[in-house]
């Protein structure tokens, strides 16, 4: 029952957050906006990036101008999230082991990734029997993803990043 609720909420909230916090430059909602939302709603939040300046555009994933505009928009939400208590980290080696460790610490993980040429985010709920339990707003069922699948997903053209969320009681 728990997972059926998570799936439904995942899709509902994705649409809600996209309406409220949508990017002015890319399709979807910046994770920094979600970090701000969760932080101001009294959840413990960590926003982690592999790159020293949040993202890189060395692969020319976006035009230079679009990258600059998108990065500035992202940074504005980062400031807001940090102001209300989110912990923001840059230059972190985001690995499968780190994800497993954070799941063991009772965090839910919103993991950014890339599917073909599109950036996308999934919710990782747990790690059990050598698989990650993944809620993807594009599907209506819990998916089991291997370490390899998650590792491939999270390596994007602009870096790796994730949002960790849990109740403050931990």
Question: Residue locations for each model-derived region?
Answer:
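Active-site nucleophile-adjacent alpha helix/oxyanion-hole segment immediately C-terminal to the catalytic cysteine
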Residues: 1-48, 97-101
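Internal catalytic-core helix/loop-beta-alpha segment
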Residues: 68-111
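Short His-Asn-centered micro-motif
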Residues: 28, 49, 91-92, 111-114, ...
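Short gly/ser-rich anion-binding loops that grip negatively charged ligand groups
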Residues: 24-28, 64, 89
């Amino acid at each position: 029952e728990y997972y059926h609720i998570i799936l439904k909420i995942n899709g509902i909230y994705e649409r809600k957050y996209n309406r409220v916090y949508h990017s002015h430059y890319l399709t979807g909602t910046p994770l920094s906006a979600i970090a701000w939302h969760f932080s101001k709603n009294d959840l413990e939040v960590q926003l982690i990036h592999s790159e020293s300046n949040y993202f890189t555009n060395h692969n020319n994933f976006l035009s230079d101008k679009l990258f600059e505009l998108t990065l500035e928009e992202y940074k504005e939400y980062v400031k807001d999230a940090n102001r209300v208590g989110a912990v923001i980290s840059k230059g972190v080696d985001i690995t499968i082991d780190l994800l497993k460790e954070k799941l063991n610490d009772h965090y839910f993980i919103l993991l950014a990734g890339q599917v073909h040429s599109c950036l996308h985010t999934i919710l990782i709920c747990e790690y059990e029997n050598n698989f990650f339990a993944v809620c993807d707003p594009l599907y209506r069922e819990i998916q089991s993803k291997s370490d390899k699948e998650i590792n491939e997903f999270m390596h994007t053209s602009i870096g790796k990043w994730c949002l960790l969320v849990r109740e403050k009681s931990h």
